[in-house]
Amino acid sequence: MGIRLYRAYTPGTRFRSVSEFTDITRSKPEKSLTYGRHRSQGRNNRGIITSRHRGGGHKRLSREIDFRRDKVGIPARVATIEYDPNRNCRIALLNYQDGEKRYVLHPRGLMVGEEIIAGPDAPLQLGNALPLSKIPLGTGIHNIEVSPGQGGKLVRAAGGVAQLVAKEGSYVTVRLPSGEVRLVLKECSATIGQVGNVDASNVTIGKAGRKRWLGQRPKVRGVVMNPVDHPHGGGEGRAPIGRSKPVTPWGHPALGKRTRKRNKYSNALIIRRRK
């Protein structure tokens, strides 16, 4: 799987690139694992915009993804590798020996027909889910839990992989793709391997209309607005922002200001902050 480039047949294809779908083995999802979801278009319950630049986009069916991997000791065979419009990685359909079907994130290199399993006694092989205490140091992992049994929260994007670097006491030390090094309880589980579709970050959108297909509306710069609309607005011609530092439309510092809460509970678990 790679990136497909286009010739400049039209201005819209000049810089366009898309992911190849050669790894996908099925076009329609498993109906029992899909559901519809109301799209809020960035509005709250009163219809007021609370998240700008959202709206439109193609209709989507949501897939139920198993982030918990809580079917312990029951082998499952990979039936298909499918496209998911709600994330940039692929998903794999698992057929368990007891007859149940579930979707999981597709690890890079996992093939149709292979067998995977979850649990503390699972072998150390691609796609298996184990507690962090059972995983050797230096192993690449993804879909990492933050609280035991809660389901994977960390390293779920396409191409993501974290590394287990140390074990001490009740915690293990994990290096995340962002460069952050943090502690995680050793009872938490993770999946062996790297998330698939590693070239997703190299895709070029190419034209404005493709952003609209994804449900993203135009982002207008504050400096070209009127003073009533943005603190950067106004002036004669191409005027500077007129402030010592850039701010948001509501006057808060922007572009470089750290937004993480100072008293967040997980600060004590972070050894080195992200780059």
UniProtKB/Swiss-Prot annotation:
Q: Does the keyword Ribosomal protein apply?
A: yes
Protein's cellular compartments:
Plastid, Chloroplast
PROSITE patterns hit by this protein: RIBOSOMAL_L2 (PS00467)
GO CC terms on record? chloroplast; mitochondrial large ribosomal subunit
Assembly, in brief, is: Part of the 50S ribosomal subunit.
- Chief place where the protein resides: plastid
GO terms for molecular function, please?
rRNA binding; structural constituent of ribosome; transferase activity
Name of the protein this chain belongs to: Large ribosomal subunit protein uL2c
Family to which this protein belongs: Belongs to the universal ribosomal protein uL2 family.
Determine if Manganese is one of this entry's keywords.
no
Q: Which UniProt keywords apply?
A: Chloroplast, Plastid, Ribonucleoprotein, Ribosomal protein
NCBIfam families recorded: rplB_bact (TIGR01171)
Q: What spans are recorded as compositionally biased (Basic residues)?
A: 51-60
Query: Where in this protein does the record put region Disordered?
Result: 29-60, 225-252
The biological processes this protein is annotated with in GO are: mitochondrial translation
Instruction: Supply the gene name.
Output: rpl2
Q: Which InterPro entries does the record associate with it?
A: NA-bd_OB-fold, Rib_uL2_dom2, Ribosomal_uL2, Ribosomal_uL2_bac/org-type, Ribosomal_uL2_C, Ribosomal_uL2_CS, Ribosomal_uL2_dom3, Ribosomal_uL2_RNA-bd_dom
